[in-house]
Amino acid sequence: DRLRSRGLGDVYKRQPIDQPSLWLSNGSIRFRKAFNDTIYDIKGHEATVHTTFHTGQWHFPSEKMGQKEDTDNYIVITGILETPKHLFFISLQGLYDKRKPFYGIYDKEKHITYINDANVGLTDDLTHFMPFYPITCTEEGEYAALLEIGKIDEWMDKNPGIVQEGKLSFLQEINEESNPVCVIVEP
């Protein structure tokens, strides 16, 4: 099984979901074992719990891993991006058959989690540019994605008035030989 790192809309097709995650956040090394709902801080030879995703009744029991029957309602966390204020995560319900991807943002300060259908993507409420799916984040709290010109053209055909003026007017100059567009946003 694979998780697409380029877009949540096709969330499970490219990157293996059974791989552990290791990243640096605020000078701390974080680790999450595949199919596990806990993020650990690594210091020296010790691992301490940093964050646990409380999936409640949707928690995927370890004894059911590999079983296709009666597992469609369980949720598995498949990817995480961490900024100083947020945890952006991808979860998958129905790991083996009826797959339904979600993305979530956990606000570390307010202790609130926001969940949405991953097929919707994130939308820039300032420019109303096309929905996108973050592939990386910065220590400053920004999320970034690369958008292919073909996808932008498709979106512009369906939304012609949005790029006429303002911050998106540069999109009128792109063509099929243009470089991908890097989108950087801050929640």
Feature-to-residue mapping (PLM):
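Conserved blade-ending motifs and adjacent loop-strand segments that build the rim/top face
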Residues: 50-72, 109-140, 153
